[in-house]
């Protein structure tokens, strides 16, 4: 199911989106936001927050920068990374322990090979 939705979003981005003018009020765009969530988080969480984002993308809301927030359990890796696709930025570092394990998901504009 996840692969199907990611494929549908990809088709929308490559085929349908170029045919109309850019209208998304947020960065990253709603389709990119959904793509990141479906790629890096739980299916139901991604579905809920993608729908919430799409419903907020109208003239009643201000818009702006809104990175997806994901929950991840990070285990240390002793060695250098081979490929960096995304950056995980802590939601509230060292201040709010209820936010422990929650990160902003920020896509690397250039894939970094180490």
From Swiss-Prot:
Q: How does it sit in the membrane?
A: Peripheral membrane protein
Q: Which Pfam families match?
A: YidD
A GO CC term attached to the entry: plasma membrane
Matches recorded under InterPro entries: Membr_insert_effic_factor_YidD
Is-annotated flag, keyword Protease?
no
Q: Where in the cell is it found?
A: Cell inner membrane
Q: Which domain of life is it from?
A: Bacteria
Q: Which UniProt keywords apply?
A: Cell inner membrane, Cell membrane, Membrane
Report the protein's function: Could be involved in insertion of integral membrane proteins into the membrane.
Q: Please give the NCBIfam families that the UniProt record associates with this protein.
A: membrane protein insertion efficiency factor YidD
Instruction: State the family named in the UniProt similarity comment for this chain.
Output: Belongs to the UPF0161 family.
Q: What is this protein called?
A: Putative membrane protein insertion efficiency factor
Organism, per UniProt? Answer: Wolinella succinogenes (strain ATCC 29543 / DSM 1740 / CCUG 13145 / JCM 31913 / LMG 7466 / NCTC 11488 / FDC 602W)
